[in-house]
Amino acid sequence: MKNFTPSSSNPWDSSKIQLVFRRLGFGCSLSDIDKYSNYTPEQTIEDIIDNAKLTDLTAAPEWADWDNKTFNSSGNNKAYYHTILQKQALSDMINNGFRERLSLFWSNHFVVEYLDVNQPAYLYKYYKLIQENCLGNFQTFVRKMGLAPAMLMYLNGYQNKKNSPNENYARELYELFTLGEGNGYTQQDIVETARALTGFNRTKTYMGEIEFNENTFDKGTKT
């Protein structure tokens, strides 16, 4: 905060306010400049963070729980719904700068690719999960992300079963999402984590909500 400490040679003015908003979001409005001209730099940042925590999540679209069959019978291809979600994300960036700046950061950390997932409802739930947790506890965030339908699809968690384990997500969990490559974990850790995450592969309809399936869960002891 040293660079923002007001002084005669370093006034807290519109250029500084705009700089703060560019670093914490995607810019500010004239009304923001008017408002925060009466705040200290510390008060400005605290208010931006507090407002982000209080901002409502993006409302669920009517297709938030659709399965593959419902999308296919809707009269629009899936790209149409992907575009709706993309436009909503851009609108959120304009209106909720700080939270969406963090959401953008975390979407580049917990990466999924829409062409690989190819289920708009899964991608909406992924987007909502990031909004809900971008200012929260990282451990909680990681736990929920690992069970998100989009992530289960993208890193093959839905294929992870007791008799045919898939280690893809477990490996990325350590290598990319948490500890970093070669940083204090072993192949055995990956194996045991994959076993602990088996069973999330039951759907009542094709590409509907993914549920836990006790029959494909590895109930053996993990170490």
What are these regions (language model features)?
Residues 6, 20, 57-60, 100, ...:
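Generic detection of intrinsically disordered/low-complexity segments and helix-coil linkers/edges
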Residues 16, 23, 28-131:
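N-terminal accessory alpha/beta regions
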